[in-house]
Each structure stands twice: as structure tokens, then as C-alpha cells.
Amino acid sequence: MKEMKQLLLKKIKEKSIISGVVGLGYVGLPLAVEKAKAGFKTVGFDVQQEKVELVNEGHNYIGDVVDKDLKMLVDNGMLSATNDFSFIGDVDFVAICVPTPLDKHQQPDITYVKSSAEEIAKYLKKGTMVVLESTTYPGTTEELLKPILEAGSGLVCGEDFYLGFSPERVDPGNAVYKTKNTPKVVGGIGEDAVEVIAAMYEAVLDSDVFRASSPAVAEMEKILENTYRNINIGLANEMAILCDKMGIDYWEVVDAASTKPYGFQPFYPGPGLGGHCIPLDPYYLSWKAREFGFHTSMIESSMMINDRMPEYCVDRASKLLNARSRKALNGSKVLVVGVAYKADIDDYRESPAIDVIDILDNNGAEVDYYDPYISEYKNKGDVKKGLRDIDADTVKKYDLVMITAAHKVVDYGMIAKNASLVFDTKNAMKDYSGNDNIEVL
């Protein structure tokens, strides 16, 4: 066992280790690129043939990856992609970066993790380090992954291969913190595994590596990060609803509270939560808590508040149309600006704006959308195309404009000047908040 550790550490030091990344999405591709840039030959795997071909041609499809970096790494042979799991037999260190969504019953769906583990097990060789990076409930690494890998490979964890967990911390569109400079948390089954995982990430990243005492600690800390955000955004949404009823500007309240130099962190309301982590992760924790007879009442309350925000925003929009324009939502023309789940990115996973559009449509509104980063999106098997651009004449055609993502490149001054009515759920038009035609969440 010590010999296995020493060999892996030696390979890491010499940059002779071959790294594998399973899943080439928003998490996996940036990680694969950073490993290759650090001098480790890296092979990425994805079930989508299109992604494999794009990577092997040096074409980037992820906003947080620099195009020229990907092309250079592919051209010099440091990075390649495949859809054949047999590559696992050639790698020494493999990171699993696959989706962990919810099923139709809002229960954890770890199908991708399970199927990846089953395929990896078929080709797993002695001396390999396996790390799960997908966000999941505490216990997944030891209770699910370990038995699958051992049963499928005939190898013993800790003796023949190492296993650990290191949560991804990707924040799409963040201009400051990328994969390279975001601190990493690592947890392994056994101290030797932790040492190997930490050594690898210390060789790849320009950031601190925190060594957790177990995979469960590392799994729980990621859930804590996102549940913390979920709960505080839920509080902000509830406060915004109350402030509206009381005739108080919540955004001014937050600005005032933010002057306190300690003990307060601002959170802002919106049409709901989006992205792959924050709306979903608390469900993973709540589900796991029931195994221990524990009810996560605060967490579930915040989830309920956040999940209802798209409907609340449409209700506010309907009342606004009725009060200001004496029009019903049914038959009104509505332009939704921004379908990305947050500002300045092209990612619409779990975006509340899509729910807003669905609810508007179901209530009889004639809905179009504009997003400078997303020309079309898929939802429930259908494709909805957005407007290619908007100008004064375009905006004047609509009874209501709803702002659901605060993209900086949008001309809000033009909207403020020409829109009949605006409902701004993101305070994107704060510079024009004095206009009579604008109402803010």
C-alpha cells in the first residue's frame, strides 16, 4: 500500500502521471485543461460524441476555458478526448465530473455517477487514484462508489487502488475565481489517499488545498456551501415579498444593511434559483437527512420559497399590468429579457426565467425572450428561439418587459425610455428606478 502511494507521488512530482477526466462539461473540461496545462497528459471522456469531436479538434464550447489554451494543448498532444471507457486502463488518476440532477420526484438521481463507476470498474487497474468531484449527498463515495468499484474490478480499495472525494467549485462566468485559483477541499478513504489527491491538486492549482478527515466531510462541506446560499437567498426573497406589501424598497434596505462592516453579508432576491448546484443540492441533503429520522425544516422552507418565486413574479407582473395599464395578462405581449440563470453567461440550466416564460405562456400571454448569450433553448423537448436583437421599436411593441437576468451588455437605458411597463426582478435598471414605468421586485 505504501509502495502504491510512493509510486503515485513520484509520478506526480515527475509529471509522468496520466490523468483522466470523466465528463467534459462545465466542471470537467476546465479541470482537464488545467491538468494538461500543469504538464500532466490528460484524457477526457464524454458520452456525447459532439463534445469529443470538438475537443479533439481544439474547439472550445465552455465559457471558462480559453480557446487558445485548448487548441494548444490538443495540438501538442497533452489533451485528448474519447467516448471509449477503456482509456481508464491507461490512466493513473481519474476524476469523475458527471451531473447529479434530481428525478421527477425531486429525489437525488445519481444514475450518472453509478454508471460511470460501473464502467470505470471494468478497466480499473492496480495503483489508480479515483476521485469523485460531482456534488452529492454525504456518504456517496464510501457507500455507493467504493462497493461498485470493488465488485466490478475485483480490487480492494486502499490496497489496490485509492478512492476519494473533492467537490467541484466551478462558478461559471466568475471573472476572478476559476478552477486554477479556487481553493480545493479533498477527502479520501485513508490517509494515503488524501495525501495523493492533495499532491495532485497542489501540482495543478495555484490555491490552497484543505485536507478533510474523510470523504463524508468533503461531501458535506459542498452541500453546506450551497445550502447556505439557498437559505440566505430564500430569506432575501421572503424579505422582498414582505417589503413590497409594506411599501418598503428592499434593495435600499440591503444597501443600508451592507454599511455594517461585520456580521452581515448581502443576498439579493430574484425570480428563483438557477444553475446546477444551488437549487438542487439542498434536496440531496434533505433526502439523506430522512435516513437519520431528521427533518431539515429550515432548508425545506427556503427551498419552498425559492421554488415559488417564478410564480410570484408572474403574479406581480399580472397585477402590475392590471394596475398600470388596465390590461389582463391573458393576451398581453410580454418580452422576457435574460434566460440565463445568472448575469453574463450562456448557461440556462435550471434557470427560473424558463419557468417564468412557461407560466406566462400558460396564463395566455404572448411571450418572446431576448438574451444576448442564448439564441435558443431546449425545454421539455421543445426548442424556443429568442429575438436576435432588440431596439426601441422592438420594445415598444410589448405591453410588459420583464428583466430576469442582469446582463451588463443589455441597453437598459433604451428599455427604460421606450418600454410601456417594466418589471425588473434583478434590479438591473437601478439607474432608472425613478421612472414611473419601472417596478422592481
Model-derived regions, located:
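Structural/interface elements that position substrates and couple domains in central-metabolism enzymes
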Residues: 1-441
